[in-house]
Amino acid sequence: LECALYSVSTVQEEIGLRGAITSTYAVDPHVGVAVDVTHATDCPTIDKKTEGDVRLGGGPVIYRGPNMNPVVTSRLVSIAGRLEMTYQPAASGRPTGTDAN
């Protein structure tokens, strides 16, 4: 895949999704991928029925949902499979609160 890759570290994405706006003006990307944290649910204080089954050490999480580009998501899953990389699928029924929304 031939492409230009830009990596940007941002802040304030939880407050109005403002963190990456200034960077995107300069870069004008075709696709954005947010690398962010999520919560492991393999502890007694989190309900897996509500939050899903995400295990610490279980591999990166690839989310599906209405704000995730299905083509990009499918491509990430395909690449993980080709590389025999363990990943954890998860779902989000709403915007995620990251700069990629």
Pin down the residues of each PLM region.
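Active-site-adjacent substrate-binding region
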Residues: G52-N101
